[in-house]
């Protein structure tokens, strides 16, 4: 049981040495000196060092001892209770002590980029609502608009961003004909979507009815017309046909 623990401990030691060497924490000269120390130790497991096994089914046992807690320098890890530690592993407990004074650097954290906020008057942005024809700024009267309502010298002049252009470039007008901006203006303000207009044909028909009272009266249903029609069908001796006729 002790030999198995020693073998596992040696394997961990070699793995740790390889990791330290690969990470650049120890030099190749230091690595060679440690390996030479392990090879020169008469109690080392040569089968593990050379990758060969001198026994057919068993590993060569190594010397092991129980480590006295007082022998371990302060600040180094202590072995667990009743845990046999190999002499080689105990000799390597001081490995990396020269690095113990280095300050541990916290992992670098990546801050999320803040979303662009509305520019202030310090940037001399002219109000896009005031600048765009046919629009008025609702916040200017309340004194809440952060933009200039004047042609400030050196101010950024851009109209509102076209709603349809911002929505996947769906504007049917060219950049020259559209009164809104077909580019990401610095103020980042997009024009609202136009409201649906009522049909001109519907408005014109209603206006025509109002201008012709007789025509409007004819379009309205009068119950007296039904009574007159019933009298005509009775005089002809036939019933009035159904509505689906």
Curated annotation (Swiss-Prot):
What InterPro entries does this protein map onto?
Znf_CCCH
* Sorted UniProt keywords: Metal-binding, Repeat, Zinc, Zinc-finger
- Return the protein name: Brasilane terpene glycosides biosynthesis cluster protein D
Chain spans, region Disordered: 186-245
In its UniProt entry, the species of origin is given as Annulohypoxylon truncatum (Hypoxylon truncatum)
List each coiled-coil range. none
Q: Does the keyword Zinc apply?
A: yes
Q: Where are the zinc fingers (C3H1-type)?
A: 121-152, 161-185
The question of whether Zinc-finger is a record keyword is answered with: yes
Q: What does this protein do, in the record's words? A: Part of the gene cluster that mediates the biosynthesis of the brasilane terpene glycosides brasilane D and E. The biosynthesis starts with the activity of the terpene cyclase braA that converts farnesyl pyrophosphate into the sesquiterpene alcohol trichobrasilenol. Subsequently, trichobrasilenol is glycosylated by the O-glycosyltransferase braB putatively using UDP-GlcNAc as sugar donor to yield brasilane A. The latter then undergoes two rounds of oxidation performed by the cytochrome P450 monooxygenase braC.
GO MF annotations, alphabetized: zinc ion binding
Concerning PROSITE patterns, the annotation shows: ZF_C3H1
Question: Where is composition skewed (Basic and acidic residues) in this entry?
Answer: 209-226
